[in-house]
Design a protein with these regions (language model features):
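Active-site neighborhoods and metal-handling regions in enzymes and metal-associated proteins
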Residues: 1-231
């Protein structure tokens, strides 16, 4: 399947189930090659954050997309499946293309779709967890005082790709001691010391499905209040 790297993407779906992929200018061929839909459109609203000009591009429009899936009316109801992930640029482009449309939050539809997984989806998640588990085990075997947090992440990255992941499921991080106060964090050049508490969060992506494992590791003996907190 297709998922964008540094551009954005969207899927327009009509009430009768016809669908089209919408991608940014640099994902036209990539998107068409990797997605199962037979309709792919290039819209500047989905361009990357550096905001390139693309002077020779003749982009598609939301009208082109909607027409291709059988929608020609202008006074329509448009459901946005994730307001949280829809940029201002994309939202404004929809409003400008369909000024008479009623735009509503359709996030509940995605929640319902995600609530029940097909056997294929479960297979992707199981494979992702299998790979993430191997990465976790390999990092635990290799971790030692003197190694940096980033070196530990490097081990995990090597292992997930060696074992079949198409990408990291989420940005992987390994952080230690004071940084373990963070709910999420970025790995640093800090070197592990004896007695450190180290938090692993390692992941693998299979066909767009992300599986992540979080696990604490102690480089030594865990005692007192530290033991109470971790356990």
């Amino acid at each position: 399947g297709f998922w964008p790297l540094f551009e954005r993407a969207g899927v327009a779906i009509s009430a009768d189930g016809r669908a089209a992929l919408m991608v940014g200018p640099e994902s036209a061929v990539f998107g068409a090659d990797r997605n199962p839909l037979d309709k792919t459109f290039v819209l500047t609203a989905y361009r990357e954050g550096a905001d390139p000009a693309y002077p020779e591009l003749k982009p598609d429009t939301f009208h082109d997309v909607f027409k291709a899936i059988g929608i020609t009316e202008k006074k329509i109801r448009i459901g946005v499946a994730s307001f949280l992930d829809t940029s201002v640029t994309i939202f404004n482009a929809i409003c400008e293309a369909f000024p008479e449309a009623e735009i509503v939050d359709a996030g509940h539809i995605m929640v319902e779709l995600r609530s029940i997984k097909s056997e294929n989806e479960l297979a992707c998640l199981r494979e992702g967890y299998r790979i993430a588990n191997i990465a976790t085990e390999e990092v635990i075997k290799a971790i030692r005082p003197g190694m940096t947090e980033l070196q530990a992440v490097g081990i995990a990255q090597r292992v997930v790709y060696e074992n079949g992941a198409e990408y990291e499921g989420l940005p992987m991080y390994v952080f230690s001691e004071a940084s373990t106060r963070h709910a999420i964090s970025r790995s640093s050049y800090r070197r592990f010391e004896k007695g450190d508490i180290v938090q692993l969060n390692l992941s693998a992506k299979i066909d767009g499905y992300s599986a992540a494992i979080g696990y604490p590791v102690i480089l030594g003996k865990l005692e007192g209040k530290r033991r109470d907190i971790v356990l």
